[in-house]
């Protein structure tokens, strides 16, 4: 009887996972999807409270549990919130619970993140400067990873050379990651790090050549370019800057890193699951101009996160869904940024459409994957209305393809060679773009990341095939133009 009961519950669990569109195998693309899980979000009120059981592992390839810290006396890795992290004294056992997700989701890797803003920089600077302290730290990390069965360490030292750090941190950071890498390699542990995107940081904080060499992958924090601290409105994560010399944009960061030799496949593109809030200096501002419209230098709080200048997407989308809200939705085309505003407030954020565009941007540049900071502020409960324009820009690019015959030939060629396309299809003798359809409501941003990877991959494949066919036909025409006499069939086939 006990065996039958166990079998029944196993069937129910599997049926639930499959029925709501979520499987156990994880993502079926080849990109890294790093999902940061910020432990402190469990303390947020009401629907903003996030626990480990809210994670949807099928949408991630890697989880990073944030954060643990550095003991400033022993210089060993240590937990920060014993009640949430450990099982002792009736604790919630966060370490064990998040690692246990690997048992059911075999594709998953789970790392622990060390550092973060509240940890500061001074004690990390001191540890990295001293070979003996580095050795103590690294040995403690090895023991920690083995004891709790984590797969690796994500280094979030905020930040070398700053906030109590020293200029020598740039050199000592390399010593630290080199020695960590050498210690990790025999055991297969992952070593990753989150890197700031600003030009000053990239110039003075990181020795990019060595960072690129020693880290398994680099998580580029392509967000927080602008906020209320600027005193004017701006996009949190603009793809393009406001002018050609603007260094505060994703485009500038990515070009800088690629020009300095970073390996694209080791770069992970950071995606913010949140927005930045502003309050106007005076009520009733009519026209918003990014980089010019003035604001107070402290933003307002959201109802769940309760942090000045910050609102999670799960808070913002509730305002959009609320029919009585005074906020109106807008789109800033140049930076590819959504924003909402009323007479007093302004919020720049990322929604499914801007996320889909960023996925396309990073895929075109060969990035190895994407990170979500943090999944706890996605609409993980599925409380909000589905946004209707997620793939608007993909549709517009599709509609701009003028040579439909060439497009059809490319699809036929791909179908014959690879077994068909999922999104670019021929139906009723017409080429159509079939967009991904959500099978469940929660995690709209994280779902979009995964969906857009497939869509962007197929778009590039189709365009490449069109260019290949066009080149082949041009070459054949040039070869056959003289002295061969071409037949009507050939001329018609080539569309002349």
Predicted segments with their positions:
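Substrate-binding surface in catalytic domains of secreted glycosidases
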Residues: 45, 73-92, 160-316
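Glycan-binding loop/region signatures in secreted carbohydrate-active enzymes
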Residues: 24-29, 114, 228-229, 235-237, ...
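Non-catalytic positions within long, well-ordered alpha-helices that form the structural scaffold/packing
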Residues: 56, 146, 211, 258, ...
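Glycan-recognition patch characteristic of GH18 chitinases/ENGases
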Residues: 20-145, 171, 396-398, 404-478
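A cross-domain feature marking catalytic cores of carbohydrate-active enzymes
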Residues: 37-39, 67, 112-116, 157-159, ...
